[in-house]
Amino acid sequence: MLLSSVRNYYSTLPLKDHDHTRYVTALALSMFDQWRKIYQMPDRMRTLLHMAGLLHDAGQVINYYSHARHSAYMTANAHIFGWSHKEQVLCALITAFHHGFSGKILKSIKETQILTEKEIDRVKILSAFLALAESLDENHEQCISQVICTSTPSSLNIHIYLNRDNFICLLYTSDAA
């Protein structure tokens, strides 16, 4: 029910780049799945990351340049069925931080008072996955074919594999910088 409700809500938004949304969501979920044991995340956190991935750019309908903050507001106030109030707050925070963590935003959302420290730590981790996925598709060209996430006792490693038109995608990204 939750996924259907989020998809229905998303379909009402005048967003244009659905491929980017699906792609970023898939990359974030791939990282979650590969590093899940390290962070000891329950299944429901994966679901919330999935929902946040679908909603991460919703705020663009209000203001492109501060869309992460607006995505959080829209997610927190959307009439979406299938999650608890706490889960809606968690998802809103994940969308808020998909361009980096902000203590200012965390303090400005009064509903965060219902969250535990562990839940806020999970939000930081999940939003980091979403932020990394977003940065891997900054040019909206879907140039990455696969991410392989590994770890050692002292590091987390990510190997990025490019797909079709790899060189052209890299040139496009370099020119845009």
Residue positions per predicted region:
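Cytosolic transmitter module of two-component histidine kinases
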Residues: 16-17
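A short interface-forming secondary-structure element
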Residues: 158-171
